[in-house]
Amino acid sequence: MRIIQTTGKRKTAIARAVIREGKGRVRINGKPVELVEPEIARFTILEPLILAGEEIWNSVDIDVKVQGGGFMGQAEAARIAIARALVEWTGDMNLKEKFIKYDRTMLVGDPRRTEPHKPNRSTKGPRAKRQKSYR
């Protein structure tokens, strides 16, 4: 039995996906993906599976464990982990090209992070300045 483990990161969320032969079950933190709320996060997670097609989707079981970040960061981290797992599972370069053509961040990841707050007025944000008055 073949088992593949992959990871995906987005902002501060980290997802670990385990893919194995199965019947098309997808679980996020132990719950079926159908129960993931809000709906936009669920569709984000399912994007790579829809692009891969029913044939691949119904031949594997995917378990994803996600921690850190907010709900959308977690959904995008899970999406990256699932896409990488499917590419590694199939070994198909056409699938990899399809993912990259659809959305490059599905495989590559997004390096943007939040900017750290700077001293003085740091509660307002990293670049906030005191308003200057000339009169």
UniProtKB/Swiss-Prot annotation:
Which intervals carry biased composition (Basic and acidic residues)?
Answer: 108-118
Q: GO molecular function terms here?
A: RNA binding; structural constituent of ribosome
Q: Tell me the Gene Ontology biological-process terms attached to this UniProt entry.
A: maturation of SSU-rRNA from tricistronic rRNA transcript (SSU-rRNA, 5.8S rRNA, LSU-rRNA); translation
- GO cellular component annotations, sorted alphabetically? cytosolic small ribosomal subunit
* Gene3D superfamilies xref list: 3.30.230.10
Alphabetical keyword list: Ribonucleoprotein, Ribosomal protein
Question: Which spans does this entry mark as compositional bias, Basic residues?
Answer: 119-135
Q: Residue ranges of region Disordered? A: 108-135
Query: PANTHER family, per this entry?
Result: RIBOSOMAL PROTEIN S16, RIBOSOMAL PROTEIN S9
Q: Which family does it belong to?
A: Belongs to the universal ribosomal protein uS9 family.
Q: What is this protein called?
A: Small ribosomal subunit protein uS9
Q: Tell me the organism.
A: Pyrococcus abyssi (strain GE5 / Orsay)
